[in-house]
Amino acid sequence: LGDVHGGAGEQCAELYNDVAKIMEKEDIDIAVIQGLDKWREKYGEIVSGFGHRFHKPVDPRAPLLMSKVREAAENNVVSGVFADIGEKVQEEIGKQRGNKPIAMNIDGATAVIFCELGFPAPLSRGLFCLSRSVGILAHGWEQMQMGGRNKGPMPPSILPTYKSN
């Protein structure tokens, strides 16, 4: 787990929080441009949370999550401000690429969710690990329920013995 796998959501949440802070004095369009400029000064040209090497032109997971955020905003569960920011960032990156659209990926969408729920950006990596841990636990349990030997160290009773002559 590093800055690309697991850390991208943290970096994206940092961007969204920076944009939200700028929005205290500027409108969303200006805030997004300034936020992206600040982010790129720190991290470089590629913006975490957007684009995917396999899911093109759309990461199919992101629109589903974003629709759930929009639904929660309609029901006053969350504000929807970070959903607006995420979608505006996506739009602005596309404009800056010569009107070439870019997909919000799963990290961009989960960063929206974490920000909407009030989690500080540094907790995003831990939340990513937590969700993966639940999946690993479920997979292990499923394998155990199938019966038979589960992959792992060989029991000592069936290890081959090597004797020198």
Where are these regions (language model features)?
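Non-transmembrane, aqueous-exposed alpha-helical and coiled segments at domain scale
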Residues: 1-165
